[in-house]
């Protein structure tokens, strides 16, 4: 997997993890995000980290549908410019269009796009080539965030006429029905989509600010998401190595005593050569990082 994400997305998850009683520093480290990425100047982290955060969050809190909880305890500005592009838009529909147009300022690994905008409906799709639970939770979070934000801005309970998810149907989808306000939710679909009818699409935002919206759009047009620094890949590698058992427990298992550079590169969605180059840029090597992981495992 290639690409990068804004640290704002990681902080978004970690804020909710902290509220749930988890240690955000430890959770970030387990996902491959070092303190420098979160506390330093604006930058980016490897695209794997955000999805790993969601997976770890769900696993440790042991509650289903944590992506839907993205709307809980929301603080204005958590997602930076994106928050204000959505809130200052003239209508709900314009907010969705702004989120789709400028979403690449937050992530290059996933995209939100308007796939239908007709006389009667507006449909957005959260697209990614990535499979797995992290991607499923990220899709939940994207739709939960947008729905909650436009409800707040419009001062109305915006109810989608249809929502589809690629994920398999959960045993109980009451939480989805309760949050979105509709039973028209399909699981196992070909794409993650959310559809609004004309009435909700054209609802006016009480927080609309045309002048500020224009300034924000001009700024977003020239903004771009940076490439993760070399050190970010060292943090991600350390997290991946630390997730392996010290010794092999079965023929098919991977452990710290058997893992190869090629295998770990595959797990990180890159090539062995690229991983070596990134480690060299950070002033380290595969052998050094593997030795460090074995020392940590030995305790």
Sequence positions of predicted segments:
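Extended mid-to-C-terminal alpha-helical interaction segments
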Residues: 170, 178-299
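N-terminal low-complexity or simple alpha-helical regulatory segments
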Residues: 1-122
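Residues within well-ordered alpha helices
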Residues: 16, 26-27, 149, 240, ...
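Short, contiguous, pocket-lining structural segments
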Residues: 19, 134, 138, 229, ...
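N-terminal regulatory/effector-sensing and dimerization cores
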Residues: 80-200
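Short amphipathic alpha-helical face segments that pack within enzyme cores
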Residues: 12, 141-145, 297
């Amino acid at each position: 997997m290639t690409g990068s994400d804004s640290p704002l997305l990681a902080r978004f998850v970690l804020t909710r993890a902290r509220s749930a009683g988890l240690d955000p520093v430890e959770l970030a480290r387990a996902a491959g995000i070092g303190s420098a990425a979160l506390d330093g100047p604006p930058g980016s982290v490897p695209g794997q980290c955000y999805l790993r955060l969601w997976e770890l969050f769900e696993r440790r809190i042991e509650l289903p549908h944590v992506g839907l909880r993205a709307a809980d305890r929301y603080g204005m500005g958590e997602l930076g410019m994106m928050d204000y592009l959505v809130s200052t838009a003239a209508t709900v529909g314009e907010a969705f269009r702004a989120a789709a147009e400028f979403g690449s300022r937050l992530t290059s690994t996933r995209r939100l796009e308007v796939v239908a905008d007709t006389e009667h409906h507006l449909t957005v799709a959260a697209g990614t080539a990535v499979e797995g639970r992290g991607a499923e939770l990220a899709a939940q979070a994207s739709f939960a965030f947008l729905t909650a934000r436009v409800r707040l801005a419009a001062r109305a309970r915006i109810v989608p006429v249809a929502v589809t998810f690629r994920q398999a149907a959960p045993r109980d989808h009451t939480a989805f029905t309760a949050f979105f306000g509709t039973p028209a939710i399909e699981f196992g679909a070909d794409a993650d989509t959310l559809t609004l009818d004309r009435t909700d699409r054209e609802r006016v935002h009480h927080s609309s600010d045309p002048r500020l919206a224009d300034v924000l759009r001009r700024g977003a047009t020239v903004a771009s998401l940076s490439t993760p620094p070399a050190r970010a890949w060292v943090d991600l590698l350390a997290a991946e190595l630390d997730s392996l058992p010290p010794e092999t427990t079965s023929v098919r298992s991977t452990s710290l005593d058997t893992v190869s550079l090629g295998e770990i590169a595959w797990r990180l969605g890159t090539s062995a050569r690229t991983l070596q180059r990134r480690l060299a840029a950070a002033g380290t090597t595969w052998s050094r990082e593997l030795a460090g992981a074995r020392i940590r495992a030995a305790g």
